[in-house]
């Protein structure tokens, strides 16, 4: 009924009428309801994201440059062909690469990654008037090449173009944006990545110009994936109805939809999940990517799914102490290699906060939550 009441996924289009997934996903975060963003269901109109933006902007551009993402999130994004790049991890933390996806984390690109989009954040020669623009320049680590549009809109990686400063970011150790040898050690990307998503592209910390953006609490894409998830648990045989709403999200994202034949973007569809378990995992992965870095959606999902193992153990990033553009695992100075950034502990009792002892003392009928 949402569509009948004027709500819709926010989309922008190329000159030929095709969906521009880069501009659609990016401006979904910045456009207000009265500017055509009918995806917003609930929002806080009076909200400040100054600190969020300030901590996401690179140190060399006068930001604090410490708000980033983990390697595990980078791994979760699909390839441009709609297939997952990483399907899991070995006991030693090594990624299990999906060879069918074309993913490669060895070497660097020799050609720019050019797509049909008006998005101008990918390289210095990008223009809104262009039919096509570079979204990843030549020389980009292959881990970041041929990924889906949501990846480039969401993650700022070493060597990416940063338009506000007209330069490529430098996350190498003691680099312009990297970890310093002394001083404010945390004002640098601890995992080798910073956030790009929800940081308005016109943000300029140098003159403290941070454009307004709505505080979106709930949007239509979440309603779609909530419905798909619930239906898969209740009536998994209704595959067509489930995929309808998953595919609506993937359509806007510019990646192949599930099914057979051509999808609405003219792309070859990829095989649909084979059973309820596979569908559950597909929906969960779509949620992780689509809602990355939006409030507590991911954490709340993990809690309600009771996936305790995701919340504990080793979390990876790139080698923030690396000084060389190298992906050689045997080179201690190589930046582009996986490194354990932090090891976290999480037990079952951490699914909930305890009730304060003062409250228990006031009401003998209250019972403490499990394991506290």
Regions found by a protein language model. Give the residues of each.
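Short, hydrophobic/aromatic alpha-helical segments in well-folded domains
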Residues: 150, 226-227, 245
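Alpha-helical solenoid scaffolds that mediate protein-protein interactions
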Residues: 1-3, 249
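Flexible, polar/acidic helix-loop-strand segments at domain edges
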Residues: 72-219
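Structural register within alpha-helical repeat arrays
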Residues: 220, 227-229, 234
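Structural helix-adjacent loops and short alpha-helical linkers that scaffold large soluble proteins
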Residues: 234-242
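Long, intrinsically disordered, low-complexity segments
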Residues: 10-88, 172-173, 177-186, 191-195, ...
């Amino acid at each position: 009924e949402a569509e009948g009441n004027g709500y819709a996924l926010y989309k922008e289009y190329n000159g030929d009428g095709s969906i521009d997934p880069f501009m659609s996903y990016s401006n979904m975060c910045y456009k207000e309801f009265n500017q055509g963003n009918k995806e917003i269901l609930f929002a806080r109109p009076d909200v400040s994201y100054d600190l969020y933006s300030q901590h996401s902007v690179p140190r060399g551009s006068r930001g604090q440059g410490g708000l980033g993402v983990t390697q595990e999130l980078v791994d979760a994004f699909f390839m441009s062909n709609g297939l997952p790049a990483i399907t899991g991890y070995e006991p030693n933390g090594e990624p299990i690469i999906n060879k069918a996806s074309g993913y490669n984390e060895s070497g660097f690109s020799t050609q720019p990654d050019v797509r049909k989009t008006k998005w101008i954040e990918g390289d210095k020669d990008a223009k809104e008037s262009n039919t096509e623009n570079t979204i990843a320049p030549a020389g980009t680590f292959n881990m970041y090449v041929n990924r889906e549009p949501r990846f480039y809109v969401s993650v700022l990686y070493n060597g990416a173009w940063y338009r506000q400063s007209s330069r490529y970011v430098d996350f190498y150790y003691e680099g312009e944006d990297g970890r310093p040898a002394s001083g404010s050690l945390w004002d640098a990307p601890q995992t080798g990545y910073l956030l790009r998503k929800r940081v308005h592209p016109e943000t300029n910390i140098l003159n403290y110009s941070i454009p307004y953006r709505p505080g979106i609490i709930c949007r239509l894409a979440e309603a779609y994936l909530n419905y798909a998830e619930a239906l898969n648990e209740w009536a998994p045989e209704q595959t067509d109805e489930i995929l309808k709403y998953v595919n609506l999200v993937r359509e806007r994202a510019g990646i192949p939809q599930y099914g057979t034949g051509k999808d609405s973007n003219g792309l070859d569809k990829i095989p649909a999940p084979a059973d309820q378990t596979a569908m559950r995992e597909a929906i969960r992965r779509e949620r992780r990517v689509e809602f990355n870095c939006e409030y507590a959606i991911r954490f709340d999902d993990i809690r309600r799914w009771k996936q305790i193992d995701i919340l504990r153990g080793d979390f990876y990033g790139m080698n923030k102490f690396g000084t060389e553009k190298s992906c050689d695992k045997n080179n201690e100075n190589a930046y582009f290699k996986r490194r354990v950034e932090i090891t976290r502990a999480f037990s079952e009792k951490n699914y909930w906060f305890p009730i304060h002892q003062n409250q228990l003392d006031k009401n003998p009928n209250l019972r403490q939550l499990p394991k506290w």
